[in-house]
């Protein structure tokens, strides 16, 4: 119903002869409080934390895939490649040269998006409490997971290594 009201109000503006600034009576508030989602504990202390974390979420991701029947993971890498991509991002975040460690999928933007999507799809089966608000999943990913922190650290490392701007900047939302 809400979407219909917004569209109808927008269509009413088509008849205006001058520019119009209209305010919709309902405001959607953005809630950036991270959603509550328990991640399985570390299993293998001998591998980087984001790799171990991604492997631990695989069962939840698979359940979400069965429940939904589809996934948005796969623009650059598939679910099987998420741990390997996180391994490379971890190497970059800890000082390795971005030119020496090849990222599967090649495109940092779509690889980062696939990793985030993998996590968010897995999380939907693990989330507790009320329905997550707008940006709650984003906040959880970047603030509450090893993978999110690794992407942000890799982004900073790439910037510090003077990698091309588009290569690192778009790995995460600009406000991050």
Label each region the model flagged.
Residues 1-21:
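A charged, well-structured terminal subsegment
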Residues 1-4, 47-51, 144-148, 155:
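Short, structured coil/loop segments at alpha-helix boundaries
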Residues 5, 12, 59, 63, ...:
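Charged/polar, solvent-exposed surface patches and flexible loops
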Residues 19-85:
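Charge-patterned, long linear interaction tracts outside catalytic cores
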Residues 63-176:
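Extended non-globular C-terminal regions
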């Amino acid at each position: 119903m809400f979407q219909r009201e917004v569209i109808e109000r927008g269509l009413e503006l088509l008849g205006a002869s001058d520019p119009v600034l209209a305010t919709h009576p309902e405001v959607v508030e953005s809630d950036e409080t991270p959603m509550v989602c328990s991640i399985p504990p570390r299993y293998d202390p001998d591998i980087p934390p984001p790799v171990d974390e991604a492997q631990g979420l695989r069962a939840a991701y698979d359940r979400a895939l069965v429940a939904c029947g589809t996934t948005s993971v796969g623009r650059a890498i598939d679910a099987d490649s998420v741990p390997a991509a996180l391994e490379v991002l971890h190497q970059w975040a800890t000082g390795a040269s971005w030119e020496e460690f090849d990222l599967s999928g090649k495109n940092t933007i779509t690889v980062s998006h696939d990793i985030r999507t993998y996590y968010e799809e897995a999380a939907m089966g693990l989330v507790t409490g009320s329905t997550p608000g707008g940006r709650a999943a984003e906040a959880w990913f970047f603030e509450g997971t090893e993978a999110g922190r690794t992407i942000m650290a890799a982004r900073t490392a790439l910037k510090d290594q003077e990698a091309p701007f588009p290569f690192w900047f778009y790995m995460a939302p600009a406000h991050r």
